[in-house]
């Protein structure tokens, strides 16, 4: 699908002012402005933000009440359960909360529980409450889940178990009352940045981030008490693709600094088995190495063992668990490849509407989210990938950048048993006999209710440059904007009238070539752009959208362009 190129522009006088006052190039100044950083003070705060810039945790509603209840439980030696989730964010949030309570003197009274994807599925359920009651637990703290767990919370109240919900997912809203009034479980207290009566969302923390803030509050704001947990919160924050702004950016920035020096056996062994040996860790390194391994446990087996891996003080145990996790991830990759191939084959036999909605009885439930993501990347449209078992279809939905998948599911909720998630990623369950009706509903929603622009991938270009302007000095300026991620993407640049040469396809359909302009020449790589080679060979010059990166090879550091899109040159903006 063709992408729309949109060039961001700013008044030249203001751009020159920001460039001069912050002592950066006009290119970097424009990137700052595009990230809504529009004063020199805001720019310097962005450049220099560190652990001491974290928000006051007591700004989060419900946190003071939670602190008092947890302190009381530790004082009175009540049994406490940390109830997490089986993805990386939920696992790391569990680790944080478990270790915080242990370090506060609750080591003999606290335990944790991660539900199975294949038994109870996502979330906080009545079955967990029943087991907790049988163990004599009187306080349950949920992390990364619970905001819609009405039945489980009601059952806990009947059994005199207090529930503290810490979550970051969207609550249900009472449409009959007010769009912004959340419909909440009757818990002892709830900590969730998404609960705000004016509908704003000033603190888009991950589940691990919320747990870290509660841990900070339990330690009266003493940052030293949570320093060794920042690397754990970083993994959850990167994994859940929350906006890398404000506290999230600080957590990731500080975590990247600290994780290479980690004293935690589980982290040391995960870095070793993932072959991570760079002196300068970047967010995407973890997205493709450690995080998939952590997620593999929840996708393929028992995620409780990952909590053990990340909390053990034994290097031998950590090594054993890291090897187990790595083997599990290899198995996950094999199954994922098989399901992806099957899904692509199925698409060739059906008529595709405005979204991909496919199901099969043989597809492993644990890899459906990854396959859905790859469907989105390949076909540039929302994707719903489902497994059918005993008449129930259950699976994952993934979306393109501008399309809110959660709103779509809400519109079609009368066909669903259950759904939940975020704008870009969600889970759903429905009776298999309703898949056709659900498919029709999704297509109807896209055609009649969503905006046409929602389905067009837009490349927001920060600045049009010449190749001469792309140098190590510019890359040094860009490094001050890191860490990059959702809502703080790598600078996206454009250039026109480029002459291609040395074209070749490498790896799995990746395009390698050199681009030249006015005497400047630069190497490029375009992932999944190998098919473009035929039309590029038929034109004299091209326009390109790209992110500049540093390529390190044999001790040399050169600037390389990561191509995002190409078109024949036409001289227009």
Give residue spans per PLM region.
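Catalytic domains of riboflavin
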Residues: 1-3, 481-482
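Short alpha-helical basic/polar micro-motif
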Residues: 209, 369, 373, 544
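Short, well-ordered strand-loop elements centered on a beta-strand within folded domains, enriched
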Residues: 182, 187-190, 391-399, 522-525, ...
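Active-site cavity-forming subdomains of large catalytic enzyme subunits
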Residues: 130-208, 212-219, 228, 245
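Histidine-centered active-site/metal-ligand motif
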Residues: 168-169, 364, 422, 510
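Mid-to-C-terminal polyanion-binding domains and interfaces
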Residues: 68, 72-76, 317-321, 327-358, ...
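A generic local secondary-structure boundary/capping motif
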Residues: 153, 179, 199-202, 277-278, ...
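Hydrophobic helix-and-loop "lid/oligomerization" segment in the mid-to-C-terminal part
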Residues: 2, 8-139, 159-160, 177, ...
